[in-house]
Structure formats: C-alpha cells, structure tokens
Amino acid sequence: MLHFLSMLVLLVQPLGDLGAEMKTLSQRSITNTCTLVLCSPTENGLPGRDGRDGREGPRGEKGDPGLPGPMGLSGLPGPRGPVGPKGENGSAGEPGPKGERGLVGPPGSPGISGPAGKEGPSGKQGNIGPQGKPGPKGEAGPKGEVGAPGMQGSAGAKGPAGPKGERGAPGEQGAPGNAGAAGPAGPAGPQGAPGSRGPPGLKGDRGAPGDRGIKGESGLPDSAALRQQMEALNGKLQRLEAAFSRYKKAALFPDGQSVGDKIFRAANSEEPFEDAKEMCRQAGGQLASPRSATENAAVQQLVTAHSKAAFLSMTDVGTEGKFTYPTGEALVYSNWAPGEPNNNGGAENCVEIFTNGQWNDKACGEQRLVICEF
C-alpha cells in the first residue's frame, strides 16, 4: 500500500518539480528508497498500474568509443569538386609520334639586323672570266732620264749629195807637177844643123778644170749629232737597267701572275695598308691596281691561292666615296661587291679584294695580304 502511495505522489507531482527532482537524484547517490515517503515495513500489495513515461533525462557523459563495426558499402560518388591548384611539372614523357605538317603561317615582320658575321672560309677558285674589252689608252708617263751612251752603230746608208758649198779661199801654190806625157810625133822635118841648147822657157798658163769626180762615202757625223745619239742610247740603257732591277726584286716574291706588261706578285705576309704600300715601293713596284677584268682575275688567283683577302692600291682619302689610283687618277675599272662601298663605321678608306674577285671598302689599319704590281 505504501508503495502504491509513493507512486501516486510521484505521479501527481508537477512535471517541473519532477524534472528538478530527477536531476537532483541523478547528481547524488540514492541511499534510501523511501526518501520522499516515510516507509514502514508492510506486506507486499498488488502491483500498481504502469505509470506514464517520464520526460527524457539529460544527456549522459560521452561513453568510451565502441569497437569498430564492419565496413559499410561504398556510398554513391559525391559531386565533382572544384579544380585544385596546378601541380608541379611531371617528368618529361617520351616524344609522341610526329604530327602532320601544319599550315604555313603568315610571314613574320623582318627582324633586326644581326651583327656582321665573321668572314667565311674562302670559296673554291672560280673559272677565269672572259677577257674584258681593252681599256682606254692611258696618259703618257713622265719623260725618262737620259740613258747611258750606247755602242757605236754601223755605218749608215749613203745619203744624197748635199748642196754645193761656197767657193773656198784659194789655196797655196802647190809644188810643180810632174812632166806630162810626150805628145805624138810630128812629121819629120828636114835635118837641120844642130844648134846650141837654149835657156828654159816660161811656165805655161793653168789648164781648164777637169770634170767633177764621183762623191766619196759619208764620213763620221759631227760631234753634236754624235752626242745626241749617245744620250739616247744612255737613256735606253738606264731604262733597261731599271726594268731589270724591278724584275730582279719581283723575283724575290714567292709566286705571281703575269698579264700583258704587268706582273702581280704576292708576299707571304699580312700588313696594314701603309706598311704594305711601303713594302711594294721598296721592291720597285706598287700595290696591285687592276685596271681590267683580266688583271682583276690574275689578282684573284693569288688571293684564292693564299685564302686571304688582299689590299689594293686605291683609296678615297682625298674625297669620301671617290676612289682613285695612287696617281690621283679616277678608276677606269671596278668590281664592287653588292652594297659596297658603304664606309661602314665612317673609317673605311681603303679597298680589299675577296677570293671571289669582288671589292670591299675596308679600314686601312686592318692587316691584309700584300700583293705588289710590277
């Protein structure tokens, strides 16, 4: 009966108080089942009806994790996530097969001109070109020095008779002439009596002049004509000696080419323009000055044989862009490379010849092969 009353008290207690009471009971240990109602020992009565379910108690403390359950089935794939950051480049793969040739793109704009490249190796020697037309006749050179007198020439042919000279002064009386030949005998006269020998008779008158004789051979020329001949021969001898000296000096150069009256010789050295010019002058010549395609081809053969460009004698030191020979004469022949002369850098006053025979203006301080002209 007491149990029943206890249960009844609990049921009629307000829900707020019951929750507070339940909370109090959960925080302290229950020492006596009869805290709310004074209990006394009685006999057990009939069981009461089931009471109504109480409110859910407060959440208890989190318990220890249980044992892992079996792995569930894979869920459906979630939606595609955003693109992640770019990863590091992977190692290079093997090259794929060559693709088909693409369409030709439009031509690009011209690039900036690069620096001038180094001079390429000399090309093979080309064939000698056809002989050019003869150039105009050059100006007469300065008169040479009077040569040494030559040897006595042979007697010349008999010249025509000169005009009759003036009558000379009478000469001194000559010695008496020899007795003339006896005349023919006259007819015999009667025999006379021999008389005494008489005195010598007077000298007879001078006879009439005889006919003019044949003209004799011409004698030696007078001293003035002889002197002129000696001076002319002396000049020829000096010119021959000078020519022989030039050929003798030219023979000191290792190789050369002959064109007409000119000889081109190459030295085994490379010099600046002024030193090269002086070297040729001391040898009795000058730097090569080709005045025709034939002469230019001869110089080209020497340049090709040495595989080096060479200086020519022409410069534009006097007037920029106007190249002349050492004598100041304007060029009668040229073989400039395309775009030359261009005075690159503002200091190209000399001329060099390439292995292809073309010309280029060059700084005179550069070193080039020495080729002299004799």
From Swiss-Prot:
GO terms for molecular function: identical protein binding; lipopolysaccharide binding; monosaccharide binding. It comes from the Eukaryota. The modification Hydroxyproline is found at P77, P95, P170, P176. Disulfide bonds join C280-C372, C350-C364. Residues 45-221 form the Collagen-like domain. Its main location: secreted. Residues 259-374 form the C-type lectin domain. S-nitrosylation at Cys-34 and Cys-39 alters the quaternary structure which results in a pro-inflammatory chemoattractive signaling activity with macrophages. Residues 222-253 form a coiled coil. Gene3D superfamilies: Mannose-Binding Protein A, subunit A, SFTPD helical domain. Residues 1-19 form the signal peptide. Contributes to the lung's defense against inhaled microorganisms, organic antigens and toxins. Interacts with compounds such as bacterial lipopolysaccharides, oligosaccharides and fatty acids and modulates leukocyte action in immune response. May participate in the extracellular reorganization or turnover of pulmonary surfactant. Binds strongly maltose residues and to a lesser extent other alpha-glucosyl moieties. This is Pulmonary surfactant-associated protein D. The gene is Sftpd.
